[in-house]
């Protein structure tokens, strides 16, 4: 068994069948984070052998803390792919709450453009911590950074051996927190990254019938 498969042991398996080639959803993920978020989704997609998933790392220079820019960038990339005749089936943006004054506008625009948005409060690191333990009480970004450092994190890099296979536990822990009812004002802690993970797992365990 390969190292990749061992990391996802116990999770849903990809249904591979010989013969007729299956077509899978083509998914675009545009991540606001400079390193952590793209690294997580690139690795997760690789473990799923999700070759039709494209993860985009946005250059933070000139972007600032503006989730609307993430949404607009995703729409731009989707339009280009559509013009090239190979449209995405799903488009996702991954952003943090942090101190985003423009989050409401970004959510409105994402809804108008039919782009899904995964928001974490206070930041994406809460989703990472849920792979290790339950956390339902209010928490800030600095505390999350300290907790993850105890688990081998160094700066924004995800350590080798991170338990990606614990994504189901992370989803369950996210569900125990107050649910996101108003997208631009999610409770702390919370994360709708679980919805994105669910979309990826579903797309790559249940091939689209052609």
Where are these regions (language model features)?
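Conserved beta-strand elements of the Class I
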Residues: 28-30
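Short acidic, Gly/Ser-rich segments with clustered Asp/Glu that frequently serve as metal-coordination loops
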Residues: 33-36
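Glycine-rich, highly charged phosphate/nucleotide-binding loops
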Residues: 70-80
């Amino acid at each position: 068994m390969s190292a990749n498969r061992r990391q996802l042991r116990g999770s849903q398996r990809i249904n591979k069948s010989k013969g007729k080639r299956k077509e899978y959803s083509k998914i675009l993920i545009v991540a606001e984070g400079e390193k952590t978020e793209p690294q997580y989704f690139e690795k997760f997609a690789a473990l799923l052998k999700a070759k039709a998933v494209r993860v985009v790392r946005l250059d933070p220079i000139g972007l600032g803390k503006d989730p609307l820019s993430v949404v607009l960038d995703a729409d731009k990339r989707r339009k280009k792919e559509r013009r090239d005749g190979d449209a995405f089936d799903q488009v996702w943006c991954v952003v943090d709450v942090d101190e985003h004054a423009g989050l409401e506008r970004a959510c409105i625009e994402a809804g108008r453009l039919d782009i899904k948005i995964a928001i974490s409060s206070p930041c994406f690191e809460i989703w990472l911590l849920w792979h290790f333990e339950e956390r339902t009480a209010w928490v800030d970004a600095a505390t999350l950074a300290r907790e993850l450092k105890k688990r081998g994190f160094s700066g924004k890099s995800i350590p080798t051996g991170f338990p990606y296979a614990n994504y189901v536990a992370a989803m369950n822990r996210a569900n125990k927190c107050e649910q996101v009812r108003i997208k631009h004002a999610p409770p702390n802690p919370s994360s709708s990254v679980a919805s994105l993970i669910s979309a990826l797992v579903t797309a790559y365990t249940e091939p689209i019938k052609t």
